[in-house]
């Protein structure tokens, strides 16, 4: 059997020989100094079944060794990593990327058609500059909002952890801490994420990870335009102290003519009124959950008309500005007004200005040595004491310190005999 590359018996002219793999940051690892082994024609691609150069490396400490799974041609056709088959730009599965970009997979599945298609794509890749994807992905216009919201911008290195030790699950692992595999409980076998196929991920069908992300995208909040067509005002919140009116105008002028921009610095918000409803809808669609000015993410909502605010107040029962609330139990009553300057010099107890002097009867126990009163008589009573001339009859006592009966102790004179 001929084994030279020039033999067309097994189409060896199309075998791949590469110098460096196409990897994402997560699969490459956080260590910038890694050793990578290279094996020419070490395995066949799991998509096109052609031999290709296999690279193998360890992405970090206590991580499992990883290797390339598909050839670089299949990787460039889908713009994916050779190991995890996730999109290199967004870090998402191919099914999610194609759904967000409205792409349809037109790759053939049969062996002969797949080989012919791959050769044509290789010719197209060779004629391009190599910086942009080819095929249907290269013809895509722009990224959608869903892809920007679901995009994974930071590497997730936990994906490189070792697999679970099957001996530990059975209780037979004797390596202990030296075991290179994880000693953890495995996931539920009924979990859809436990069954993943590399071909299904590449072709974008029956991918459980993609289904999970698409369900999350369907529950994301959306900014629907109000039914009232007269509303052309947008609310922009979270301005802070650094964003000015000119910076808002520089961003929103691209959507249409701006009538007014009102910045409420105290509330750190602004109201932008457009001349047409179409311009306001376009600004709301392009800016909702995506507006960043001076490194600050701003909140964009639709403004509300005065009629709508009045209806909401009537619905909530708060239309009357003088709404009366129920008094809180346990609070003291209203305090009297403060005294005038003339009265405050002598009236220390907030007594009323007019009225007769009150007589204060003080009942004290008899001094020691005196017997109690006879039966049928009350306790010893002392003559009433008149208050000082500057004190007047006490009115309503508001505080205990205003009670003249509590000002010191009053001792009676002992009776002789």
Swiss-Prot record:
InterPro entries to which the protein is assigned, alphabetical: Cwc2/Slt11 (IPR039171), Nucleotide-bd_a/b_plait_sf (IPR012677), RBD_domain_sf (IPR035979), RRM_dom (IPR000504), STL11/RBM22-like_N (IPR048995), Znf_CCCH (IPR000571), Znf_CCCH_sf (IPR036855)
Gene3D superfamilies named among the record's database cross-references: 3.30.70.330, Zinc finger, CCCH-type
Domain comment in the entry: The C-terminal RRM domain and the zinc finger motif are necessary for RNA-binding.
Amino acid composition bias (Pro residues), ranges on this chain: 364-391
Region feature (Disordered): 303-417
A Gene Ontology BP annotation from the UniProt entry: mRNA cis splicing, via spliceosome
GO molecular function, one term: pre-mRNA binding
Sequence similarity: Belongs to the SLT11 family.
Keywords, comma-separated and alphabetical: Cytoplasm, Developmental protein, Metal-binding, mRNA processing, mRNA splicing, Nucleus, RNA-binding, Spliceosome, Zinc, Zinc-finger
Keyword presence, rRNA-binding: no
Naturally occurring in which organism (per UniProt): Xenopus tropicalis (Western clawed frog)
A single Gene Ontology CC term: spliceosomal complex
Highest rank taxon of the organism: Eukaryota
Subunit-structure text: Component of the pre-catalytic and catalytic spliceosome complexes. Component of the postcatalytic spliceosome P complex.
Reported function: Required for pre-mRNA splicing as component of the activated spliceosome. Involved in the first step of pre-mRNA splicing. Binds directly to the internal stem-loop (ISL) domain of the U6 snRNA and to the pre-mRNA intron near the 5' splice site during the activation and catalytic phases of the spliceosome cycle.
Comp. bias intervals (Basic and acidic residues): 309-318
Entry's localization field: Nucleus; Cytoplasm
Zinc fingers, C3H1-type class: 159-186
Protein name (database record): Pre-mRNA-splicing factor RBM22
Keyword Cytoplasm: yes
Annotated RRM domain residues: 232-305
């Amino acid at each position: 059997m001929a084994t030279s590359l020039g033999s067309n018996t097994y189409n060896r002219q199309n075998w791949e020989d590469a110098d460096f793999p196409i990897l994402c940051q997560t699969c490459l690892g956080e260590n910038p100094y890694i050793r990578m082994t290279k094996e020419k024609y070490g395995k066949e691609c799991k998509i096109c079944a052609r031999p290709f150069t296999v690279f193998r490396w360890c992405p970090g400490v206590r991580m499992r060794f990883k290797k390339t799974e598909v050839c670089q041609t299949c990787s460039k056709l889908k713009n994916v990593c050779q190991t995890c088959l996730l999109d290199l730009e967004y870090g998402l599965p191919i099914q999610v990327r194609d759904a967000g970009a409205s792409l349809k997979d037109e790759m053939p599945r049969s062996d002969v058609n797949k080989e012919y298609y791959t050769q044509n794509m290789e010719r197209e890749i060779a004629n391009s500059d190599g910086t942009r994807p080819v095929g249907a992905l290269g013809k895509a216009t722009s990224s959608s909002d869903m892809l920007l919201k679901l995009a994974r911008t930071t590497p997730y290195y936990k994906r490189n952890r070792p697999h679970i030790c099957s001996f530990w699950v059975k209780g037979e692992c004797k390596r202990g801490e030296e075991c290179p595999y994880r000693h953890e409980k495995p996931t539920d076998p009924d979990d859809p994420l436990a069954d993943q196929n590399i071909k299904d991920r590449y072709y974008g069908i029956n991918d459980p990870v993609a289904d999970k992300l698409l369900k999350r995208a369907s529950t994301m909040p959306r900014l629907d335009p109000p039914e009232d067509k007269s509303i052309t005002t947008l609310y922009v919140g979270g301005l802070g102290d650094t964003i000015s009116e000119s910076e808002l105008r520089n961003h929103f002028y691209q959507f249409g003519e701006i009538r007014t921009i009102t910045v409420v610095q105290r509330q750190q918000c602004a109201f932008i009124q457009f001349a047409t409803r179409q311009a306001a809808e376009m600004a709301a669609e392009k800016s909702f959950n995506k507006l960043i000015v001076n490194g600050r993410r701003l909140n964009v909502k639709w403004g509300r008309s005065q009629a709508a605010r009045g209806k909401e107040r009537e619905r909530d029962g708060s239309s009357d500005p003088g709404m009366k609330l129920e008094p809180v139990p346990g609070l003291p009553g209203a305090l009297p007004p403060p005294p005038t300057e003339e009265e405050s010099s002598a009236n220390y107890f907030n007594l009323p200005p007019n009225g007769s002097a009150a007589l204060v009867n003080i009942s004290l126990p008899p001094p020691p040595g005196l017997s109690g009163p006879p039966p049928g008589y009350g306790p010893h009573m002392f003559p009433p004491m008149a208050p000082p001339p500057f004190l007047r009859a006490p009115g309503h006592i508001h505080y205990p310190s205003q009670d003249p009966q509590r000002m010191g102790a009053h001792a009676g004179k002992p009776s002789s005999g």
